[in-house]
Amino acid sequence: MKKISKFIISVIIFISFNLFNPIQKASAIGEVDWLLLKENNDGKEWVDLGSIRKIKDNEISVLTKYFQNPNKEKVKGETNLYVMRINCETKEYKDISVNGIPSFKAQWKTSNDDELIDVVIDKSCNEINT
């Protein structure tokens, strides 16, 4: 019983600290510079120009937003946020976070000629090189 009580108290303290931590709130607030890159029958793709960061020689990370147009499965459509890691030399990418949830097992892949992904890769790599 004592172990359960200690666990519950620890969880409450952890949640309270995260909810009421002014430093965390301040660092989470920031301006987003969304640029609509492309719109097609599948949806719309934006990139946050202020989020583009160089990681290694040919690798960058960038925050993107994708709105999937309504279809038979999703009547209202769906918006998702991705943190993409992009290799500008090979034009490969991996989604390292989706809607704030880390994807620890993300694998490098090509766009398979998806024009919305291609435009993100091209614009992001061009921005970091200018």
Language-model regions: role of each:
Residues 10-19:
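Bacterial N-terminal signal peptides
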